[in-house]
């Protein structure tokens, strides 16, 4: 799927919402829907898809899967921990840290001026922190 633009608009919102939904599927399904060269990083139960849509690098975090203990554990680590700009939910911080090295290396290699982040549930929290 191609069609993202650099502006904030309904088309972009729809595409990124679809990516949030498709992030619950396997890599083959994600590649078929968005980009045959999309990659999946799956580290200690945190999953994130990265792909390109023209001049825009895109990152979609998978949300909580109720059958996955690692997701439930991340959601339940509710104690706040200090970060440079305030406080953050410990489970969300830990889950993002699990995949961030892979995501940041992938983003650096893309050399894109624009990056879009998305996710649902736990994935939405990770997308917010990543942005």
Show which residues each predicted segment covers.
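Active-site loop->helix "elbow" adjoining a glycine-rich segment at hydrolase catalytic centers
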Residues: 121-126
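Charged, compositionally biased non-catalytic regions
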Residues: 1-31
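A conserved cap/lid and substrate-binding interface adjacent to the catalytic center
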Residues: 22-118, 129
């Amino acid at each position: 799927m191609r069609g993202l633009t650099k502006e904030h608009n309904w088309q972009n919102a729809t595409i990124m919402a679809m990516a949030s939904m498709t992030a619950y599927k396997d890599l083959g399904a994600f590649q078929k829907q968005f980009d045959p060269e999309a990659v999946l990083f799956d580290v200690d139960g945190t999953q994130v898809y990265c792909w390109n849509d023209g001049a825009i690098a895109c990152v979609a975090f998978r949300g909580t899967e109720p059958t996955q203990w690692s997701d439930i554990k991340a959601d339940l680590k509710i104690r706040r921990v200090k970060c440079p700009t305030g406080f953050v939910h410990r489970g969300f911080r830990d889950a993002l840290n699990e995949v961030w090295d892979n995501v940041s290396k992938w983003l650096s290699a893309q050399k894109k001026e624009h990056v879009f982040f998305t996710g649902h549930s736990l994935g939405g929290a990770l997308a917010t922190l990543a942005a």
